[in-house]
Amino acid sequence: MNYTNSSVGSGSRTGRRAFEFGRTYVVRPKGKHQATIIWLHGLGDNGSSWSQLLESLPLPNIKWICPTAPTRPVALLGGFPCAAWFDVGELSEDCPDDFEGLDSSAAHIANLLSTEPADIKLGIGGFSMGAATALYSATCFALGKYGNGNPYPVNLMTIIGLSGWLPGARNVRNKIQGSHEAARRAASLPIFLCHGLCDEVVPHKYGERSNHALSLAGFQNLAFKSYDGLGHYTVPKEMDEVCNWLNARLGL
């Protein structure tokens, strides 16, 4: 399944090139379909590898949708083309965020969820850059709009971020606290963050800072879990806790 226009639904008005999204992999529920979760891979990966892991989880009532990011030049890699949800340079407070790329990917994800049945609970999860995109989607949901001002169309029920960070963290609090409705949505959205203390790719401090920024912005249903000895990868204990979180928060 290919989606050929990355700016569908994002309302991009610039002349920048629209990147083509890769293949989307779907893991069908083995039991009664109660929830659909988009799962987003990390930089340079694809949806296939995560779909195989997710299929093995004891969550029979969840449908997993694992899209593949567009291949685009990535500043962090010296402009080398790579599968990436958005462009990223160094991870720092001063590095500008690629909000056009983030909006494009967030819109692609929302479009995938928007075709699900009305009674199905919806969520977004991801690893590393995928986690960053999931957290950006959480802020779009709370604000009711993408960064470019176009309306965000999906009602999210949960967010999971493994080894990631929050793009645009500096401005999230002011944006959300400026709207009663945004503050209400932020307070209602369960977010589960996990991060390894030995992560050398996205250091643990970025997970801590993201958790702090989300908490200050009013995301009250927030959990942050640290793992001793864990680098930039996942382990069964972490995925077990993801399963427990989803069962509890989605009532599966």
Question: Over which residues does each language-model region extend?
Answer:
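Short hydrophobic segments within beta-strands
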Residues: 39-40, 125, 162, 194
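Serine-hydrolase catalytic machinery in alpha/beta-hydrolase-like enzymes
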Residues: 2-123
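Active-site signature of alpha/beta-hydrolase-fold catalytic machinery across serine-
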Residues: 52, 136-140
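Gly/Ala-rich beta-loop-alpha elbow adjacent to hydrolase catalytic centers
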Residues: 126-130, 134
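Active-site glycine-rich loops that stabilize anionic/oxyanionic intermediates
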Residues: 42-45, 70, 128, 165, ...
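The feature captures the conserved acid-bearing segment of alpha/beta-hydrolase catalytic domains
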Residues: 28-30, 148-252
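Active-site catalytic pocket residues across diverse enzymes, especially alpha/beta-hydrolases
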Residues: 57, 141-145
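Hydrolases whose catalytic domains are alpha/beta-hydrolase-1, hotdog thioesterase
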Residues: 133-137, 145, 170
